[in-house]
């Protein structure tokens, strides 16, 4: 990777380089804004595992911003659901996924976990 030009890097390599750059200053909080959105499923899993490993080793907090609720519910302890820039629901990940209170959240969860209804 060190001998490649930026345009020669894969999406996963670019993400790993961005993560390395971000954690080089030893942040207490790493904001991951759509960090896996342009990656294939295998590379998504590798990036998530890398972040969770780094979190465990450094005790840094991770803030995931994502439209992919299937990934979010797997890795986050708490979820905030936003609609039009406003937080409409928040709570433990399992509660939000299994017992959504807001209509928008129910639609989001249904779309993510029950593709046959689309």
Regions found by a protein language model. Give the residues of each.
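Conserved ABC ATPase signature
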Residues: 5-9, 13
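Hydrophobic anchor residue at the start of the ABC signature
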Residues: 19, 47
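A short, proline-enriched helix->beta-strand linker immediately N-terminal to the Walker B motif
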Residues: 24-28
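A short, surface-exposed alpha-helical micro-motif characterized by mixed small hydrophobic
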Residues: 72-74
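ABC ATPase "signature
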Residues: 90-91
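C-terminal boundary and immediately downstream tail of ABC-type ATPase nucleotide-binding domains
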Residues: 98-118
């Amino acid at each position: 990777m060190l001998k490649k030009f930026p345009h020669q890097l894969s999406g996963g390599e670019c993400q790993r380089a961005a993560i390395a750059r971000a954690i080089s200053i030893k942040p207490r909080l790493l904001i991951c804004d759509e960090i896996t959105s342009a990656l294939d499923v295998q590379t998504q899993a590798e990036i998530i595992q890398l972040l969770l490993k780094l979190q465990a080793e450094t005790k840094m907090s991770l803030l995931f911003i994502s439209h992919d609720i299937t990934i979010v519910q797997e890795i986050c302890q708490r979820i905030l659901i936003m609609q039009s820039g406003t937080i409409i629901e928040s709570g433990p990940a399992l509660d939000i996924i299994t017992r959504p209170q807001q209509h928008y959240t129910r639609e989001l969860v249904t779309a993510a976990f029950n593709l046959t209804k689309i």
